[in-house]
């Protein structure tokens, strides 16, 4: 569980973000926008493998509601929705340490993400799958062989 922002101070938070963010934050928003536009004509769900704090998941939900409608594409999020998981993969250990140092160990909870999506009126046609993605993704794919993916993040 993370500390959610004060939604009554959205304007202030927006200004703080743009005044303090690194250029890579803006490039990420633009990249997600371009990827979403490319997926518009492709049937299938938007799938995010690793929701973490929920920013890109919420961004895709808002894009969907801006460009289409809530039922145009299901958005599926896979995450532990708890502590950022450990890794045994040597190449990922340094990256994990950097992420934990910069962003903290704790992910957004499913309840918090659902609350945020409801406040933004983007909570329809969303599915959150909690657990170890190395297990939950194969299980989900086996139970949903009809799944088509238009955007994988």
Indicate where each model-derived feature is located.
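S-adenosylmethionine/decaboxylated-SAM
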Residues: 2-23, 40, 45-153
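Conserved alpha-helix/loop element of class I SAM-dependent methyltransferases that forms part
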Residues: 29-42
């Amino acid at each position: 569980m993370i500390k959610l922002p004060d939604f009554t101070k959205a304007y202030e938070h927006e200004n703080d973000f743009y005044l303090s963010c690194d250029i890579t934050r803006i490039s990420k928003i633009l990249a997600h926008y371009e990827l979403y536009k490319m997926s518009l004509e492709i049937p299938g769900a938007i799938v995010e493998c690793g929701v973490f704090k929920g920013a890109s998941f919420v961004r895709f939900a808002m894009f969907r509601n801006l460009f289409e409608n809530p039922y145009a594409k299901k958005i599926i999020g896979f995450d532990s929705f708890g502590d950022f998981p450990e890794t045994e993969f040597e190449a990922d250990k340094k990256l994990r340490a950097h992420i934990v140092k910069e962003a903290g160990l704790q992910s957004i909870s499913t309840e918090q993400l659902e609350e945020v999506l409801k406040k933004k009126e983007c909570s329809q046609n969303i599915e959150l799958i909690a657990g170890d993605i190395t297990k939950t993704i194969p299980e989900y794919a086996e139970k949903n062989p009809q799944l088509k993916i238009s955007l994988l993040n």
